[in-house]
C-alpha cells in the first residue's frame, strides 16, 4: 500500500473553497466589502511580507470572529454538501479513485478549514489533515 497525498484547493478543486465558503456564508456584497477591508493584509501577503498563515488568520478573524460556532458548523456542512462537488476537478477524482482502487491510502492535506472539508472527505472515504478553527464559548 502506498500513501497518496493531495492538496485540496487548486489541486482537487477548480477554485478556492475558502473564498467560496465566505461568499456562501455572508453573500457576495459582504465578501467584496471584506476583501476591501482586509486589502492591507492581502497586499502584505502578495509582497511576501507576511505568511499565508498570517494572512489567512487575519481574513478568518475579519469574516468570522464572534460568529456562532453552531451556525458556522451548519453552514459549513451545507456548503460541503451543496457546493464543493461543483468545484471538484474530474481528473482529480479519477486520480483519487485510481489510488483507492489500488488500495492506496488517500489523504488530503489542506490549509482550509476542516468543517467544510470533512463532510466531503468522509463521503468519499478520504482521510483529512486540515486547519481546525478555534472555538470558545460557542463562538468562532
Language-model-detected regions and their locations in the chain:
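Short, acidic loop-to-helix structural element flanking the phosphoryl-transfer center
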Residues: 77-114
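Residue-level signature of catalytic and energy-coupling elements of molecular machines
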Residues: 10, 72, 110
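Helix-loop "lid/cap" segments that line or gate small-molecule binding pockets
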Residues: 43-47, 55-64
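Short, basic/glycine-rich phosphate-binding loops at helix/coil junctions
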Residues: 66-79, 135-140
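Active-site neighborhood of HAD-like aspartate-dependent phosphohydrolases
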Residues: 1-48
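Substrate-recognition/cap helix-loop segment adjacent to the acidic, metal-dependent catalytic center
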Residues: 112-140
Amino acid at each position: 500500500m502506498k500513501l497518496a497525498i493531495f492538496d485540496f484547493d487548486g489541486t482537487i478543486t477548480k477554485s478556492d473553497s475558502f473564498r467560496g465558503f465566505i461568499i456562501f456564508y455572508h453573500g457576495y456584497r459582504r465578501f467584496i466589502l471584506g476583501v476591501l477591508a482586509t486589502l492591507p493584509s492581502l497586499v502584505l501577503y502578495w509582497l511576501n511580507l507576511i505568511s499565508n498563515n498570517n494572512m489567512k488568520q487575519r481574513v478568518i478573524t475579519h469574516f468570522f470572529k464572534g460568529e456562532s460556532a453552531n451556525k458556522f458548523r451548519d453552514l459549513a456542512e451545507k456548503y460541503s454538501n451543496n457546493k464543493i462537488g461543483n468545484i471538484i476537478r474530474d481528473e482529480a477524482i479519477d486520480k483519487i479513485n485510481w489510488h483507492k482502487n489500488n488500495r492506496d491510502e488517500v489523504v488530503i492535506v489542506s490549509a482550509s478549514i476542516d468543517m467544510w472539508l470533512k463532510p466531503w472527505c468522509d463521503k468519499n472515504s478520504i482521510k483529512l489533515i486540515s486547519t481546525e478553527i478555534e472555538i470558545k464559548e460557542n463562538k468562532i
